[in-house]
Amino acid sequence: MSALVYFSSSSENTHRFMQRLGLPATRIPLNERERIQVDEPYILVVPSYGGGGMAGAVPRQVIRFLNDEHNRARIRGVIASGNRNFGDAWGCAGDVIAQKCGVPWLYRFELMGTQRDIDNVRKGVNEFWQQLSRSA
């Protein structure tokens, strides 16, 4: 299986989700001056910001990470978290990234996710990588 890369704000909701998921993952640093590069294909797990609108939905750290061509070339899919209070815009960072990077939006979960979300993502990630390897 290939990599998961995620960002979590100081609320740690996405981080707790990733810990419960139990799959190898790399965290995009909260400090915007710290940079990472990913050398293998990955699925990005990202929270949505901005109170429900598209403007500001993608965290700045994630924008900076994806503006690095090395990292952008390796993204294969996106999973988004959000808050259902934002209505139709909940998890919209995933929609924005999927469109801009030309990758599939794979899943959306609320806040820290439920056990069902954990199970669905674990299964979906495995199936996604298997499907990609068969089509390569």
From Swiss-Prot:
GO MF term (any one): FMN binding
GO BP term (any one): protein modification process
Gene3D superfamilies membership: 3.40.50.360
Pfam families: Flavodoxin_NdrI (PF07972)
PANTHER family named in the record: PROTEIN NRDI
HAMAP family linked: NrdI
Biological function: Probably involved in ribonucleotide reductase function.
Similarity-based family: Belongs to the NrdI family.
Protein name in the entry: Protein NrdI
Lineage: Bacteria, Pseudomonadati, Pseudomonadota, Gammaproteobacteria, Enterobacterales
